Regions:
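A glycine-rich beta-to-alpha transition motif near the start of alpha/beta enzyme domains, typified by
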Residues: 1-171, 180-338
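Glycine-rich ThDP/TPP pyrophosphate-binding loop and its adjacent helix/strand module
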Residues: 176
Length: 338
């Protein structure tokens, strides 16, 4: 038997997103978190096939459109990557929104000029996407997408982490996923392409250490636990940006975009330190040179944690449409990685 899966691929700042549009079973569950759990138990072979070689790679994120679980939402989203099922992905929401309007998917009403909005339920909570559309050569395209994210907060500041001979301090913060945020100057590793292998190794070691000794758990949802990766921050290269970052996921993959959930987490840390002015854009730069614009919207409380609701804006470009075959006779139909 040969199963067929169709996807539309895009990128945000060079970071790929693969949106499944046909061929995967519809996940069951009354919430996005339950739908994610259903995928893990009943459809994980599809995730492995789409994100592992030969069809995918360690750095790719995929998304599956699901039924909404709240009245306000247009759809739900379940995210898939080499490490499993992330609770939230900002760059994925930007890409999915762009695909929805430019390819006129059923969840998006016919686009006009100006702004259009979509609401997605995710395992981390509901997020609002605001697409800015423009007319280019007679066709409407999405110029940018601003995502109002779930509340971000600092879970634990200045956590001591011993990695090899390095005695580091990291801030553990949540922005849709948990991250360990560290000043690159303290590590002695520059934030440039030549040092990506070293950043990759160090990031994986820090993630492992934090998850072993200071594993964070979301106070409102215990299914969201552990750091998803490490964010190395340092001086920006682009004069428009305030900070540069390199995000290394716990699996060791490197984000080419500034990271949507990561940008929210960094903003929460800056806000807690009194370094984030109200109602001013925070421009975050990635190693690829891509920029995200973050805006603080309002403060709130998550359990006992002071939290910040942020809006993260970036742009996506569609790169292709794919038809994948999963042949039951193929011993590598689910792919794999070393």
């Amino acid at each position: 038997m040969i199963r067929v899966i169709k996807t539309i691929d895009a990128h945000v700042g060079g970071q790929p997103l693969r949106l499944v549009v046909d061929g995967m079973p519809r996940p069951h569950g009354k919430s996005s978190a339950q739908q994610r759990e259903w995928c893990l138990k009943h459809a994980d072979a599809y995730r492995r096939a789409l994100v592992n070689p030969p069809r995918g790679h360690a750095d790719i994120t995929a998304a599956l459109i699901t039924d909404p679980s709240t009245l306000q939402a247009n759809a739900g989203l379940v995210f898939l990557d080499a490490g499993g099922y992330p609770s939230m992905s900002g760059h994925a929401v930007i890409a999915v929104t762009t695909i929805a309007f430019e390819r006129r998917l059923a969840l998006a009403h016919p686009p006009g000029n100006g702004e259009e909005r979509l609401v997605f339920d995710t395992p981390a909570g509901s997020v609002h996407a605001r697409a800015r559309l423009e007319l280019h050569g007679g066709a409407r395209s999405v110029d940018s997408v601003a995502v109002t994210n779930v509340p971000a907060f600092v879970h634990a500041p200045a956590v001591p982490v011993l990695v090899g001979r390095r005695d580091l301090r990291v801030d553990i913060a949540f922005g849709g996923a948990f991250y360990a945020i560290v000043d690159s100057e303290a590590t002695g590793v520059p934030l440039d392409a030549a040092h990506v292998p070293e950043l990759r190794r160090l990031g994986a070691d820090i993630s492992a250490s934090v998850n072993l000794t200071h594993r964070p758990v979301h106070p409102a949802d215990s299914s969201i636990a552990g750091v998803a990766g490490v964010i190395f921050t340092g001086p920006a290269v682009d004069p428009e940006a305030h900070l540069r970052n390199v995000t290394v996921r716990a699996s060791g993959s490197v984000d080419r975009s500034p990271g949507g959930t990561g940008t929210s987490a960094v903003m929460a840390v800056l806000d807690a330190m009194g370094l984030l002015p109200d109602h001013q854009a925070f421009v975050h730069e990635s190693l690829s040179g891509a920029l995200f614009r973050g805006r603080p919207l309002h403060r709130t409380i998550v359990a006992d944690y002071p939290a910040l609701v942020t809006e993260i804006e970036g742009s996506a470009w569609i790169t292709g449409e794919h038809t994948f075959f999963l042949d039951d006779d193929d011993p590598f139909r689910e792919g794999g990685s070393f």
